[in-house]
């Protein structure tokens, strides 16, 4: 996966031209402690407890609030370390971001942190999950 910058939307550059200025993901970013990305509109008690548990481990925690599947992409690019989701989502809410995350070497797991998220289930609801 790549992060593209400086692309003029009025031009139609080729993929080779775009890749010249692209940054391969994940980017190597130095963080102080753990950077957590969470939902602006779906902050739950479980999310707060998850973040509090990270803080109890003795590392400083920085919280970034963001909307939509951008949260998955922030982990994929290296701007955030982890994204816990303790609120309802559907497969279509996560599929595109999941593809980007996997290409960048990250993945989406059930909240246990071990079982990969699966698609094309009979019930299209996602379980609570974590991106890392």
Predicted features by range, described:
Residues 85, 110-111:
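Short beta-strand and adjacent tight-turn residues that come in two discontinuous sequence segments
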Residues 56, 79-81, 101:
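Glycine-enriched alpha-helix->loop->beta-strand junction motifs that scaffold or abut catalytic
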Residues 77-82, 105-107:
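Alpha-to-beta junction loops
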